[in-house]
């Protein structure tokens, strides 16, 4: 079995996070023109989890969940919200970095890992910082309409890769991989793109012919069979509405910028993977690549994240390294909550009893091994999605439901929740809906303001 293959010598871990990366990568087939050779090569030599989902479809809470191994129903962060160290439920919960450090690992981290970085009582979780540099932005808006949020801008900028924070991080990580360590290492590398603003150098835009870029299918009647509450949940004030994007005439240009940013970050991943391959650590390093949540580019007439639909919850998830045989993708439901327990088992560390995910080692050994629980995603308080191998059930706080059959409707165009013949499926999936939920935790600074609409 896999865990024994690496039991003699503790393997290193290269833990790569990418912000806002959806399935528009070659190895997931979400966009037919996506150019991602480095990640595709990684997928070929490891295990590609094609049905992996975040626990919360927004940066802060998703990352707190990954790093703690504890879900939102326990820690109480359901949106942008509080820092890891502010959550009372996580007061004694070690980050994955801390757990590895406490068990003999040297920890390095750079870029965006936790949304608010390793600060306060988390400062000591990381032995060596790889830095967290920002990329330059133009002084004036390049592409965004005047009535859009400032972050929603895009274009071919700056001139060279060397100016980009993600490239600087990749090169710092690559340099660190040349070193010899006197103990196994856990290296966390967090890339920012394709998070907005979608500025990357011109050469990444030149990979695509804007006029020929395929746009997502978007039937005008797509939202007609949805419960009314979905509108309030999915109204994400920071992002433009689909109507605004279409009216502005910018959909194709914005889609182009996202694809260019994905190809750029693939190059950054390649710099790190090439450095690992050339290093003395090549044969003894487990690689994990993941994104904190998905991203809509007009699908279901929505932009950005926070929804409980496939585009928001589904994430790339790859494992490769010693003992992980290349093979078929795994279609069983996986959750980002499963990363922490999987790595603990692969590296033969003592278990952290508070972890709420389930190890993916059985699926690393055999991609067809069944999993006995679906992936649960929650957005805001009281709204949940249950994603099994073939189905997605969404249940809103007011009791309204959506049901999609992914065997025939991967775009989630047809809501089956009201069909009499599907009530048994709903009942079966509804058993997984969280029964108890920690109240939403708001730090004192936010309580007076209430939720941003």
What residue spans do the PLM features occupy?
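Formylglycine-dependent sulfatase
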Residues: 1-396, 400-401, 410-453
């Amino acid at each position: 079995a896999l865990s024994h293959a690496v039991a003699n010598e503790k393997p290193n871990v290269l833990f790569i996070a990418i912000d806002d990366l959806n399935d528009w990568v070659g190895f997931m087939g979400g966009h037919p023109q996506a150019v991602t050779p480095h990640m595709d090569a990684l997928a070929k030599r490891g295990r590609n989890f094609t049905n992996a989902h975040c626990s919360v479809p927004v940066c802060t809470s998703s990352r707190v969940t990954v790093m703690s191994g504890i879900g939102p129903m326990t820690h109480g962060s359901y949106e942008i919200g509080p820092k890891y160290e502010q959550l009372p439920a996580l007061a004694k919960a070690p980050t994955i970095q801390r757990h590895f450090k406490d068990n003999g690992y040297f920890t390095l981290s750079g870029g965006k890992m936790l949304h608010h970085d390793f600060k306060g009582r988390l400062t000591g979780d990381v032995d060596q910082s790889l830095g967290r540099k920002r990329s330059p932005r133009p002084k004036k808006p390049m592409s965004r309409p005047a009535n859009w949020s400032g972050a929603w801008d895009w274009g071919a900028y700056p001139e060279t890769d060397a100016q980009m924070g993600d490239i600087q991080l990749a090169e710092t990580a690559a340099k660190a991989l040349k070193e010899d360590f006197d103990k196994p290492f856990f290296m966390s590398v967090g890339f920012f793109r394709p998070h907005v603003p979608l500025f990357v150098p011109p050469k990444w835009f030149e990979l695509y012919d804007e006029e020929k870029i395929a746009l997502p299918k978007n039937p005008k009647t797509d939202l007609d069979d949805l419960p009314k509450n979905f509108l309030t949940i999915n109204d994400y004030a920071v992002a433009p509405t689909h109507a605004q994007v279409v009216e502005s005439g910018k959909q194709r240009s914005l889609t182009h910028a996202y694809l260019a940013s994905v190809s750029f970050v693939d190059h950054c991943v390649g710099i790190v993977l090439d450095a690992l391959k050339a290093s003395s650590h090549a044969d003894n390093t487990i690689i994990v690549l993941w994104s904190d949540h998905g991203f809509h580019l007009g699908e279901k007439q929505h932009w950005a994240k926070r929804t409980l639909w496939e585009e928001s919850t589904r994430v790339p998830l790859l494992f490769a390294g010693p003992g992980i045989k290349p093979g078929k993708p795994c279609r069983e439901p996986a959750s980002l909550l499963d990363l922490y327990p999987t790595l603990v088992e692969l590296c033969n560390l003592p278990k952290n009893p508070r972890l709420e995910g389930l190890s993916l080692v059985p699926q690393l050994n055999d991609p067809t091994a069944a999993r006995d629980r679906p992936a649960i995603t929650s957005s805001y308080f009281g709204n949940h999605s249950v994603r099994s191998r073939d189905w997605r059930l969404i249940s809103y706080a007011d009791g309204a439901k959506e049901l999609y059959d992914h065997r025939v409707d991967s775009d989630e165009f047809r809501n089956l929740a009201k069909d009499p013949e599907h009530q048994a499926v709903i009942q079966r999936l509804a058993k997984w809906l969280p029964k108890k939920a920690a109240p939403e935790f708001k730090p004192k600074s936010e309580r007076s303001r209430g939720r941003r609409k």
